[in-house]
Amino acid sequence: LKRACEQFSNIKIIFNKRVLTTRQTETSASVICEDQSSYNAEVIIGADGLWSEIRKNIVNDEAPRVSGHIAYRAVLPLNEVPDKARENEVILWAGPRTHLVQYPLHRGEIMNLVAVFHSHRYEEGWDVYGESSELKERFSGQHAYVLDLLAKINSWKMWVLCDREPVKNWSNGRISLLGDAAHPMLQYLAQGGCMAIEDAVCLAYHLDRQSENIIGALQAYQNNR
């Protein structure tokens, strides 16, 4: 994606900026960052995920809702994956209230592993280290291949999966939301990523059709989605 963006002179990627809030007038909108820098534009699209800062200026709701689903994530060099499972496909190993998903990354050099189980033990957590012992306990009694694969990982990152209640409005003037910032959902079947891509196509369509009426374009986009 970064390489694709770099092919266009009108796309500028700015790193190490945290957006705190937004402002808008009749003719423009702006984001204000933690370091007090600001950026102006005709339109602002908040595609900043479940914990969206942009959303706070549009939707007056509470913190994300803890789902009771916990995901442990890790990667494994392909040469450590058993031959029978070195497939260039998504493979799902399903068990009672648990499942393991594996698929290749980086041109097939590594295997991504996502182990999911149900637990109400955690209230929040994102990109923190999980305990291998807990994963072993949750997956106890499952297929030997699954247990062997899990045992090969020494360090797991843990995510407490969350979502939100649906809302009818996620646009305000020249500011709108996209993807999980607008309508977060659990990660199953990559549905959140798919919805974000659909959002982007729909948004581009309406902005192209109503380039002189940004507010109308954002409302049409929201109504379609």
Each language-model region and where it sits:
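Conserved FAD-binding catalytic core of PHBH/FMO-like flavoproteins
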Residues: 2-154
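Conserved mid-domain beta->alpha element of the FAD-binding
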Residues: 45-46, 102, 134-135, 155-225
